[in-house]
């Protein structure tokens, strides 16, 4: 990708390590609450197609749909397929320095279906995995990153990285990954299972003191944009998000999977997924988690809007299956929307459906660009106390209107008799 480096301080709204594409337009910088333009569009023969392109932390993508870190980004072949099908960006499966310590088991997935336990033919609404990070040698993954960037120089490739609580190890991993030409880093502070004893993944993301220290190491070394991926398995997700941003991260990605036990087999009485008769809690994803993910994203977006400059980004994750699902995340402030389990369910070509549905939504509401509606729905969230107050005022207003006209200008010719009657007291 043809690019130029900007060395601007935080007051300019861009990090010193942000690399911008040559056609980056500073006027496209994000705003959480764009002007309200909601309303049905009147079709025109000359109407133009909505523009799905986004520029995030200086990285230009053809659309906001990003392959989330996981099985869909395990190797060169599948990541190439994602680019060929039209995904806006690809986040590779998480890598670490020593893949020999990563040992996966089979089976490692389990499904939740609608209906009673044991239903075999109903719709899948939830997905659990006990899969670890990449078990492929780091050298192999790095060669494939480099190959992808040579073949697709204008497409965005993001490396997901995770390492033990060791400054030297983190610095080595970041240095080696960046040498391949990847466009950004996503730091996995959120994997809910596997290797917690090595202080990896959620073991760091749930400890703000550790998180602050590790983010400091990473951001002192990194020269490309850094996104911190949040765990939902915490009381207040805005706390680690705030720490990550204060420590220098350009963006937040949320959420990773939710710690869960998928269920018990009613015949064997063993938990699922069952490996040699045993199991372990794993990460829960797909459609059923979307309401939880939306709430987490909403809270992070509101925090970011009130406390940080507009150059920081937010990548929404959790249960996205349709373009309309994606629109919900964007309406709550997300710059990009990640899809992982959805790709495992529908394949890489599903991005075409996602783009078509998102464009359909935009046409319905007369939106030309993503920025025109990003963050629009944040303004409608308030406290329960305020809801009570608003409803009380609305009820009083309706009662007042029933009691009669408020002003001479409110009289109408057609309803004159009824309007007169409405103001009679006996």
Swiss-Prot record:
Transmembrane segments: none annotated. It holds the Pfam family DHO_dh. It comes from the Eukaryota. Residues 1-44 form a transit peptide. Its EC number is 1.3.1.2. Residues 395-414 are annotated as: Disordered. Disruption phenotype: No visible phenotype, but impaired degradation of both thymine and uracil. Slower germination and 2 days delay in seedling development. Keywords: Acetylation, Chloroplast, NADP, Oxidoreductase, Plastid, Transit peptide. Substrate binds at residues 129, 188-190, 256-257. Disulfide bonds: none annotated. Expressed in roots, leaves, stems, siliques and flowers. Highly expressed ion dry seeds. GO terms for cellular component: chloroplast; chloroplast stroma; plastid. Pathway: Amino-acid biosynthesis; beta-alanine biosynthesis. The modification N-acetylalanine is found at residue 45. One of its GO terms (molecular function) is dihydropyrimidine dehydrogenase (NADP+) activity. GO terms for biological process: beta-alanine biosynthetic process; cellular response to nitrogen levels; uracil catabolic process. InterPro entries: Aldolase_TIM, Dihydroorotate_DH_cat. It catalyses: 5,6-dihydrouracil + NADP(+) = uracil + NADPH + H(+). It is an enzyme of class 1 (oxidoreductase). NCBIfam families: PRK08318.1. Belongs to the dihydropyrimidine dehydrogenase family. Involved in pyrimidine base degradation. Catalyzes the reduction of uracil to 5,6-dihydrouracil (DHU) by using NADH as a specific cosubstrate and the reduction of thymine to 5,6-dihydrothymine (DHT). Involved in the recycling of nitrogen from nucleobases to general nitrogen metabolism. This is Dihydropyrimidine dehydrogenase (NADP(+)), chloroplastic. It comes from Arabidopsis thaliana.
């Amino acid at each position: 990708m043809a690019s130029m480096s900007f060395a601007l301080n935080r007051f300019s709204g861009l990090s010193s390590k942000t690399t911008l594409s040559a056609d980056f337009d500073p006027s496209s910088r994000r705003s959480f609450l764009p002007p309200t333009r909601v309303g049905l569009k009147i079709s025109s023969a000359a109407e133009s197609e909505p523009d799905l392109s986004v520029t995030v932390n200086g990285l230009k993508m053809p659309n906001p749909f990003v392959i989330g870190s996981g099985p869909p980004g395990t190797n060169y072949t599948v990541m190439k397929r994602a680019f060929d099908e039209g995904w806006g960006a690809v986040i590779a499966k998480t890598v670490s320095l020593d893949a020999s310590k990563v040992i996966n088991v089979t089976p490692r997935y389990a499904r939740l279906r609608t209906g009673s336990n044991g239903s075999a033919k109903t719709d899948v609404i939830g997905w659990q995995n006990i899969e670890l990070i990449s078990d492929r040698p780091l050298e192999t993954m790095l060669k494939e990153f480099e190959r992808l960037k040579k073949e697709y120089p204008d497409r965005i490739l993001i490396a997901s990285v995770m390492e033990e609580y060791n400054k030297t190890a983190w610095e080595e991993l970041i240095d080696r990954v960046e040498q391949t030409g990847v466009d950004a880093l996503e730091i996995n502070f959120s994997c809910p299972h596997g290797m917690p004893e090595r202080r990896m993944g959620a073991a760091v993301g749930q400890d703000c003191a550790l998180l602050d220290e590790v983010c400091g190491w990473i951001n002192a070394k990194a020269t490309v944009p850094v996104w911190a991926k949040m765990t939902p398995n915490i009381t207040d997700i805005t706390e680690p998000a705030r720490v990550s941003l204060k420590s220098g991260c350009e963006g937040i990605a949320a959420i990773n999977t939710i710690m869960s036990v998928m269920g018990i087999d009613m015949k064997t009485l063993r938990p699922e997924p069952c490996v040699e008769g045993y199991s372990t809690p794993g990460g829960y994803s797909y459609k059923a988690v979307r309401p939880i993910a939306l709430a987490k994203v909403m809270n992070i977006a509101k925090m970011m809007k009130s406390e940080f400059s507009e150059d920081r980004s937010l990548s929404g994750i959790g249960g996205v299956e349709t373009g309309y699902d994606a629109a919900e995340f964007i309406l709550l402030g997300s710059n990009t929307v990640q899809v992982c389990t959805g790709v495992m369910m529908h394949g890489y070509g599903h991005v075409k459906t996602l783009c078509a549905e998102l464009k359909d939504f935009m046409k319905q509401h007369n939106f030309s660009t993503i920025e025109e509606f990003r963050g629009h729905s944040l303004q409608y969230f308030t406290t329960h106390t305020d809801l009570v107050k608003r409803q009380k005022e609305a009820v009083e207003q309706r009662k007042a209107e029933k009691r009669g006209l408020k002003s001479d200008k409110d009289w109408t010719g057609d309803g004159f008799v009824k309007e007169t009657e409405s103001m009679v007291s006996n």
